[in-house]
Amino acid sequence: FTDAAKTLVYRTGQVAPTVAWRAGGYRLPTEAEWEKAARGGPAGLRFPHGDTITHADANFYSDAAYANYDFSDPRGYHPDYDEGALPYTSPVGAFAPNGYGLHDMAGNILEWCWDWWSGDYYSTSPYLDPRGPETASSRALRGGAWRLDAGYLRVVDRNNNRNPSYNGGTSNRYFGFRVARSAAGE
């Protein structure tokens, strides 16, 4: 996109070889960093803004199966972004930021993390600052997406790119990324 307010949708396999990920300390966040950022402060909340979610909070697919914490009306794709042309992403800043001032930590697009994916990694990882397994077949994804239900938008929910074709040069309407920056000296 040429408009900075638009959400970047990652074209798998095209960005990584051309980006100097560590230049100036910029990189993808680890899963632990991503989760801390998504919480926006208090631990223990289900979503970045509280324990319930509606279309006023994020861009996602509302499903009645999650009615105990998804209070959206109407159900289905977000009514403001279901325009008939995929992807149904929303502009950056369309929803209120979390406690750290970060937008779209739930919904809109799944975000790549630096960590390799392992479904049981956190059962054996270090308690402080886990960095993910050494290798795996795919990277971890966090945050949910415009086409996913509220269960995927929970701060603790972990995903990976289960479709092997997304590890190649395939474009994808559901994945994106946000950059983190290491503190001086890290």
What are these regions (language model features)?
Residues 171-186:
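Short, structured beta-strand segments at or near domain termini in extracellular proteins/domains
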Residues 1-162, 171-173:
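Functional-site microenvironments in short loops/helix caps that host divalent-cation chemistry
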